[in-house]
Regions:
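Pepsin/retropepsin-fold aspartyl endopeptidases
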Residues: 1-116
Length: 116
């Protein structure tokens, strides 16, 4: 799938907000926030989680919650805090916003929710 970027707004628990560019990556489970950005947003890690990084490397990354606003819709979502990674828009955040990836047009498209 071709990669593309979108602009979003992240807000931490103290109200600090930043506009940022997010690389859309459905292979990432969660939203990924670089350590430096997480510090500016004053994100508070709640736990840590083992992760497998592209290339098969294993690590343990902190997990926090952040408010994400994208195209007018807003959701609180878990995020990984990564030492050396770009900001990534992962699958859980996309699903929480009821968005899917159109890989041909390289854009996000709204989808319906499903119930059992």
């Amino acid at each position: 799938m071709g990669l593309f970027r979108v602009r979003g707004r992240l807000t931490g628990p103290t109200g600090r907000t930043e506009e940022t560019e997010l690389l859309v990556d459905t292979g990432a489970t969660l939203l990924v926030v670089p350590e430096t950005l997480a510090a500016r947003l004053e994100l508070t890690p709640r736990r840590s989680q083992p992760v497998v990084i592209a290339g098969g490397q294993r690590a343990r990354w902190p997990v926090a919650e952040v408010r994400l606003k994208l195209d007018g819709d807003e959701v609180t979502t878990p995020c990984f805090i990564a030492p050396d990674s770009p900001a990534l828009l992962g699958a859980v955040a996309l699903e929480s916003l009821f968005l899917a990836v159109d890989p041909i047009a390289k854009r996000l498209i709204p989808v319906e929710g499903f119930v059992g």
